[in-house]
Regions:
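Nucleic-acid-processing active sites and adjacent nucleic-acid-binding tracks
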Residues: 47-79
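Conserved "right-hand" nucleotidyltransferase catalytic core of DNA-directed polymerases
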Residues: 1-55, 116, 127-128, 136, ...
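Conserved catalytic core of nucleic-acid polymerases
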Residues: 197, 218, 244, 266-268, ...
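A common structural junction motif
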Residues: 480, 581-590
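Metal-dependent phosphoesterase core characteristic of DEDDh/y 3'-5' exonuclease domains
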Residues: 45-47, 84-144, 164-167
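Short, conserved charged micro-motifs
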Residues: 63, 570-577
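Acidic beta-strand-to-loop metal/phosphate-binding motif
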Residues: 24, 76-87, 370-372
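Short active-site loop/helix that positions an aromatic residue
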Residues: 32-33, 42, 85-96, 110-113, ...
């Protein structure tokens, strides 16, 4: 039976008579945005009894919330939720911050169990519980928020979450991913909560300067493409902004772009389903060097950054001047964290081709600084650990430059180990002298091989023939034979088991009948481990921050292998020293990680 509770006395009476030390919990809110949302109501289920507490327009709202605060602090010892970070931040917004650490998120549990599927509550309930006739929030709310239909809708979320948790808990132990779930993933739910509560301050002046500069670059590139293609246009000023804009009867959609590329005597192995040249990123990289293609490639980058990042951010800024991205813990099959609204992962570095300081729009509050703590060369260190290659492990232990090492092997430079040590007298000079060879070692072989790039791909990236690229690959594997052995071992395991596991036991299921699966499998061994390392590091640093409230430190962003903080200036030295040590020793591995610390008033200065 579902109980609708509205008065404080009814709420007290319901919980006083029942054991809710272990229960599932779900919230209904007015918004998904932390800064503006309010909890409309919440539902609880303990396996026997279910209730929905309606707080919408409730005159006893404050008293009931105070009682719930007491309930969470003193009675509830184990809490089950679906998409735990969201429900946790809703509670936080209502002032309910003393919540048990013993939580179970069914969304994250399912992501570990079946990384290739949808993890929504309704989809999982249909799949595992065979529930039918599931209403949406919009459908249920039409009946009124205290109607039997809406109460059933709200209570079902708690009931289904409870039932799914029983299924998934058993499965986690069967698949031997229970430790990863309880020791890494569940503490990380609180880190995600912090990220989405804290947000980061945006400098609106810099944002507008950036928009104007990037818009001008986009306009310049568009005009250049029209000129190269011989397409007519006229210029006029936008009636609202005064900025120049092009008017032309000629469109420059994908079909027209493909026709222009063909008319320039170019072709590409990348085709559309209809057999035409694809004008995607692969084709543009393949055909680089042509002035139209190069202009189009840059235009696409600038246009995407403007349309999906710069021009969208103003509408995402809350009235306290901060933007709060949504972090998705279950959005990638490798375990990597993703973000949206805005996507913090697509924040490019300033470079000569695109001289725009995207990171400069994010700044610290007065009296504080932005701190960037970035795992330096993490993927190569993890490659050494995953492969067990003695040469690569020894290189990191002796502080050798792995990119110069690979360049040395591929080009036969004849450098000694001593010369390639970062601390040696000759290193700086040799690094500059062999900058090209080092660059090829880094971007032509070290990183591409992690991603399973073939000789064709390396040839395309480095501008050499496939034969030369293959010779370079052979030299790479002769230098690091443990890497070749690890790839072969991964291939054999995938063929036999149809899945691979990272060192943290995270799984990636792939079809061995597809060629790309083998590249993805080995890359996952590194990406899966990296994703859990950043989680573990965040969890440990979060606990340290809680022990030092005087730091006034906040985790404000996670970007790939980097954790970004905002810290009070007086405590920067002691805080960054602790953060660096914790991150470098976050996991018990044969090699310690290296963390680079950057500090600045803006995110750009910290990088």
């Amino acid at each position: 039976m579902n109980h609708l509770l509205y008065s404080l006395s009814d709420v007290r009476d319901f919980f006083d008579k029942r054991d809710f030390r272990l229960c599932s919990f779900d919230t209904e809110t007015t918004s998904l945005n932390y800064h503006t949302l309010r909890m409309m109501g919440c539902s609880f289920h303990n396996g026997d009894s279910t209730c929905y507490i309606n707080l919408r327009g409730n005159p006893e709202r404050d008293s009931i919330t105070a009682y719930l605060k007491h309930l969470f602090a003193t009675h509830i010892k184990n809490l089950v939720m679906h998409n735990a970070p969201f429900d946790l931040k809703v509670l936080h917004k209502e002032g309910i911050t003393d919540v048990t650490d013993n939580i179970f998120c069914t969304m994250t549990a399912h992501h570990l169990i079946d990384e290739n599927s949808n993890h929504g509550l309704k989809e999982l309930s249909l799949r595992y519980l065979k529930v039918e006739g599931i209403r949406t929030f919009a459908e249920a709310s039409k009946y009124g928020f205290d109607s039997p239909e809406f109460v059933e809708y709200a209570c079902n979320d708690a009931i289904w979450t409870w039932e799914l948790h029983k299924i998934f808990n058993k499965k986690l132990f069967e698949l031997e991913i229970n430790r990863l779930f309880f020791e890494v993933e569940m503490p990380f739910q609180f880190t995600i909560m912090d990220l989405e509560i804290n947000g980061v301050r945006v400098n609106l002046e810099r944002l507008e300067e950036l928009r104007i500069a990037a818009s001008a670059k986009r306009f310049e590139l568009k005009r250049k493409m029209y000129d190269i293609a011989g397409l007519g246009y006229t210029l006029q000023a936008d009636m609202f902004t005064g900025e120049a804009e092009m008017v032309s009867k000629h469109k420059l959609g994908n079909q027209q772009r493909a026709q222009i590329i063909k008319s320039r005597g170019l072709d590409s192995p990348y085709k559309t389903d209809g057999g035409d040249i694809s004008v995607g990123k692969e084709t543009l990289i393949h055909l680089r060097g042509d002035e139209f293609v190069d202009a189009l490639y840059l235009y696409n980058i600038v246009d995407k950054l403007l349309s999906s990042f710069v021009e969208k951010i103003p509408s995402m800024i809350d009235d306290d001047g901060r933007v709060r991205a949504s972090y998705n813990n279950t959005g990638t099959v490798t375990g990597r964290l993703s973000s949206s609204d805005p996507n913090m992962q697509q924040n490019p570095k300033v470079n000569p081709v695109l001289p725009f300081d995207f990171k400069g729009i994010f700044e610290a509050d007065e009296g504080k600084s932005i701190v960037s703590a970035d795992y330096a060369g993490q993927e190569l260190r993890l490659l050494a650990i995953v492969s067990g290659d003695e040469t690569l492990i020894d290189a990191f232990k002796q502080n050798l430059d792995p990119h110069l090492m690979t360049g040395n092997a591929v080009f036969g430079l004849g450098l000694t180990k001593e010369q390639m040590k970062r601390t040696s007298d000759e290193y700086k000079e040799l690094k500059e002298l062999y900058d090209h060879e080092r660059h090829i070692g880094k971007n032509g072989y070290n990183f591409p091989i992690i991603y399973g790039t073939t000789s064709y791909g390396i040839a395309r990236n480095t501008g050499v023939s496939e034969e030369e690229a293959q010779a370079g690959i052979d030299k790479f594997f002769n230098t690091y034979p443990g890497v070749r052995d690890a790839i072969n071992k991964c291939t054999s395991f995938l063929k036999k088991c149809w899945h691979v596991r990272s060192l943290t036991r995270r799984r990636r299921r792939l079809d061995p009948n597809q060629k790309k699966s083998y590249r993805q499998a080995f890359n996952f061994l590194i990406q899966g481990l990296a994703s859990d390392m950043i989680r573990r590091a965040c969890n440990l640093v979060r606990e340290e921050i809680k022990r030092h409230p005087e730091w006034e430190a906040k985790i404000i962003m996670i970007v790939h292998d980097e954790i970004v903080f905002e810290i009070k200036n007086e405590y920067l030295d002691v805080a960054t020293e602790k953060i660096k040590f914790i991150m470098e020793h976050a996991m018990d591995l044969p090699l310690d990680m290296e963390v680079e610390i950057g500090i600045g008033k803006t995110y750009s200065e910290a990088k």
